[in-house]
Amino acid sequence: MEKSIFMPLLLALGLSLAGLSVSAQNHSKSVYGELLGASQMIGVNYDARFNRAVPYGLGWRTGLGFGYAYSSSSAVALSFADGEMPVAYNRMFRFAVPLEINYLLGKGKSKFESGAGAIVCLDRFTSETGGAPEHSFGAIPYLSLGYRLVTDNGFLLRAGAVPLLSFSPFRVSFYPYLGFGWAF
């Protein structure tokens, strides 16, 4: 009889202690998926604070994103983040690496996030009519403004806007973003 009570109590105690250790973490690091924003269309990112003892303040972010643009007419130039697709092509594939310095303001679960960085891009332009693809490599400067929620158990929600900057010709394109992940 004692063994049948002892094991469930030991299991309950272990689960309680594990739950306390998760909620006691400072959540200064996070991994999350992102739609749009600096990931361009879809991506996965890692974010951390320079001061690992606190879940707010100055930090950095990097990741890997993927973007795609298509036009049914090769005579129409597509606008995609930092410029226009060459007229002879009607599809663009983009691999993107966002690099950002950011700041989280707030000490509770809800924080305001702001940042500045560059998206390092490798673009591949293709056409349905054939021909050799064209490649380009570059960087797009951007800002980031948004809201970040981190629950006690580590669930992370991010939402905001990323103004992308282009300099030839000068223009600002706004991309919303939505992210879900885990803070630890």
Regions found by a protein language model. Name each.
Residues 1-27:
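Bacterial Sec-dependent N-terminal signal peptides
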